[in-house]
Structure formats: structure tokens, C-alpha cells
Amino acid sequence: MKKGFFFDMDGVLFDSLPNHARAWEIVMARHGLHFTKEDCYRQEGCTSRDVILNAYKQQMPDRQVSLEEVEAFYHEKGEKFVELGGAHPMPGAYEVLQAIRSMPDTQIWLVTGSAQLTLLDQLNHAFPGIFVRERMITAFECPHGKPRPEPYLKAWESSGLPKEECCVIENAPLGLQAARAAGLFTVIVNTVPLGYEDFAPWKPDAFLPDMRALLDYLPKLR
């Protein structure tokens, strides 16, 4: 029986990736960098710092980028994301969270590469009564983000549960890679325009089309 549920945020709890992808595309172009929506989907799960540094490393390898520049870049991208409409709760997400909360002795965790200061307020507004700050692993707690296993390892260690009682809910190949490297059971909710072949190297334990399908799948985890 699964008791610890570790949720990614963008593309799982929030239908935010189309606006994230467009914001990255626009702001990268301002800085002379080529970045497509597909690049965003494939790097989803990375910290924004890693996305920015990876783009410079691949396209302008001789360019030295300061931390101050990275912060300004991230702020600029965040403003564009809000301007484009930001994020909305993923259909079916609240029903999944409520169903898990009704199961005995369960823990619900957030594991995200985001570093938004207003994150808890957003979660409480969209999913009241579900998340607490003590069960959130963000870029502040774990700067070495996905695809490294550290974010999910930190959530697992903090939960105090055996690994076999934990379940990761992800939507991104890099998130799946991180979860599998951490040795955790992982369910993919494929809310991005990618195919199973993009996830196959890391062998997800379940591959579902959306959060409503996850709601139907939950009894198998009890």
C-alpha cells in the first residue's frame, strides 16, 4: 500500500506548461538564444537556473554568465509567464488529492524545481487544505534539481516511509529519470505532447493520459 505521494507541480497539479513554454521561447529569443516549446517540454523538471545555463552552454559556450544575470533572466521569464496568463489547476488534480487525503495514514508532498516565493499561497488557493510548507521540496531546499535524484530522495528521507510505500506522480522525462534514480515507484501522467518512447528508457511503473485516469488508477495503489 502506498502512503507517501510525491507530486511534481507544473504539468501535474497545474496546467501551466503551454504558458511556460511560450514565455521561455520569447525571453530566450530576446537574449539571442534559440529555444522551442519542445525544448521546454523535454527540460521540464529542471530548475530555471539549469535551463538558462544549459541554453548558454549549448549555444554560446564562450559566454560567461553571472548569477546576477541568471536571476534577472529568471525574473524576466516569470513576468512574461504571468503576462501570458500564468497557470490554472489541472483538471482532475484536486479530486486526486482529495482521494489520497481520504486514504489512511497518507502523506502528500510537493517536489518541484520551482523557486516561486508565493508557491504555498498558490497551492492553498487552488487546493485548499492539502499542502503544508513542511512537505514541500523546492529549488530552495534542493538546488540540485531533476534529473538528479536529490529532490525525490530528500522527500523520501523526510517522509520517514520505506521506499516501497512511496509513489511519485510525474509528467516529464527528466522527472521520471530523477524518481527512478531515487529508486521510487513512479506513475507518469502524460500531459505533455510527448510519446511513450520519450519515457521508455526509465521504465515508468504506470503510464496514464491525464489526472482523471490517475483517479481511476488510485485503488491499485491501496
Regions found by a protein language model. Name each.
Residues P104-D105, G183:
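Glycine-centered short loops/turns at secondary-structure junctions
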Residues V12, T112-S114:
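Conserved phosphate-coupling serine/threonine residues in phosphotransfer and NTP-handling enzymes
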Residues V27-M60, E83:
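Alpha-helical substrate-recognition element adjacent to the catalytic core
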Residues M1-R42:
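Active-site neighborhood of HAD-like aspartate-dependent phosphohydrolases
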Residues R30-L33, M60-V65, M103-P104, F127-V132, ...:
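Short helix-capping segments at alpha-helix termini
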Residues Y56-Q98, P104, L161:
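Metal-dependent phosphoesterase signature
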Residues W24, M28, S48-L53, Y74-F81, ...:
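Hydrophobic alpha-helical core bundles mediating ligand binding, dimerization, or RNAP-core interactions
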Residues M1-K3, Q98, A115-R222:
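Asp-based, Mg2+/Mn2+-dependent phosphohydrolase catalytic module
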